[in-house]
C-alpha cells in the first residue's frame, strides 16, 4: 500500500457534454465540505449558462463559485488556508492554467478540475491534454449517445438542428439547445463551405 503524505495533487474529471462532469466535481467538493475542509471553487466568466456565481450541473445541483476571466486571477485569492480547490469548465482557460494548477498542488492543495477533453470537432480541447498529463487522478465519464444509446465520447454541436461546420468557432457556450452527446459512429462534423465547393 502507498504511504500518503500531506502534499497536494491534481484530479481531472473529463468527458463529453452531459456525462456528469460538473455533477462529479460538485460531489467531490461537497465531500470536502462535509469533512470540514476549506473549499474554494472557480469557474470561467464565459460560462454563464445557468448562474454567474455558481457551478450548476445540467440536473440542477449547484455550489457557490468565484467567477474569473483568466486563470491568473486564481492566484489573487488568499488560498493559504484552503484544502480543496475546484475549477469547472477548465477547457475555457488558456494553457497557463496548467502551471497554475501544478503550483497549487505543489503548495499542498487538492486541486479538482473538470472539463471537456475534446471540442465539437473531436479534437483535444486547449489545455486538457497537458492537464491530463500532469494529473495524479483521472476520471473519464461518458454520456449516452442521443442517436443510438451507446456510450458517448463526443460532443455534437448543432446549429439550427444541423451539424456545425469544421471551421465554426471552437467556443460556443450552450447546453442542450446547441449540443448532444454522441458516440464515435454518430458524431458528425460538416465540411466548411470551401471544402463543399471542392467536392
Swiss-Prot record:
Binding partners and assembly: Homotetramer.
Positions with a binding annotation for Zn(2+): 145, 148, 183, 186
Catalytic site: 89
Entry protein name: Thymidine kinase
Region forming the signal peptide: none
Source organism (scientific name): Staphylococcus epidermidis (strain ATCC 35984 / DSM 28319 / BCRC 17069 / CCUG 31568 / BM 3577 / RP62A)
Main location as per UniProt: cytoplasm
HAMAP family: Thymidine_kinase
GO BP annotations listed: DNA biosynthetic process; thymidine metabolic process
Entry keyword Cell division: no
Binding of ATP, residues: 15-22, 88-91
GO molecular function: ATP binding; thymidine kinase activity; zinc ion binding
Record's keyword terms, sorted: ATP-binding, Cytoplasm, DNA synthesis, Kinase, Metal-binding, Nucleotide-binding, Transferase, Zinc
EC number of the protein: 2.7.1.21
PROSITE patterns, per the entry: TK_CELLULAR_TYPE (PS00603)
UniProt keyword Zinc, yes or no: yes
Catalysed reactions, semicolon-separated: thymidine + ATP = dTMP + ADP + H(+)
Family: Belongs to the thymidine kinase family.
Compartments where found: Cytoplasm
InterPro entries the record matches: P-loop_NTPase, Thymidine_kinase, Thymidine_kinase_CS
GO-annotated cellular components: cytosol
Amino acid at each position: 500500500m502507498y504511504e500518503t503524505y500531506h502534499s497536494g495533487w491534481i484530479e481531472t474529471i473529463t468527458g463529453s457534454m452531459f456525462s456528469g462532469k460538473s455533477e462529479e466535481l460538485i460531489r467531490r467538493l461537497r465531500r470536502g465540505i462535509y469533512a470540514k475542509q476549506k473549499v474554494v471553487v472557480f469557474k470561467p466568466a464565459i460560462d454563464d449558462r445557468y448562474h454567474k456565481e455558481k457551478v450548476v450541473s445540467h440536473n440542477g445541483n449547484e455550489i457557490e463559485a468565484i467567477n474569473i476571466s483568466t486563470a491568473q486571477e486564481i492566484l489573487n485569492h488568499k488560498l493559504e488556508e484552503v484544502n480543496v480547490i475546484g475549477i469547472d469548465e477548465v477547457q475555457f482557460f488558456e494553457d497557463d492554467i496548467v502551471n497554475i494548477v501544478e503550483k497549487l498542488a505543489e503548495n499542498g492543495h487538492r486541486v479538482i478540475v473538470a472539463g471537456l477533453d475534446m471540442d465539437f470537432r473531436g479534437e483535444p480541447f486547449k489545455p486538457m491534454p497537458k492537464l491530463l498529463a500532469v494529473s495524479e487522478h483521472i476520471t473519464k465519464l461518458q454520456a449516452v449517445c442521443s442517436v443510438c444509446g451507446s456510450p458517448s465520447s463526443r460532443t455534437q454541436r448543432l446549429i439550427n438542428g444541423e451539424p456545425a461546420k469544421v471551421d465554426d468557432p471552437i467556443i460556443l457556450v450552450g447546453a442542450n439547445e446547441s449540443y448532444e452527446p454522441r458516440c464515435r459512429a454518430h458524431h458528425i462534423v460538416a465540411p466548411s463551405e470551401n471544402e463543399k465547393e471542392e467536392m
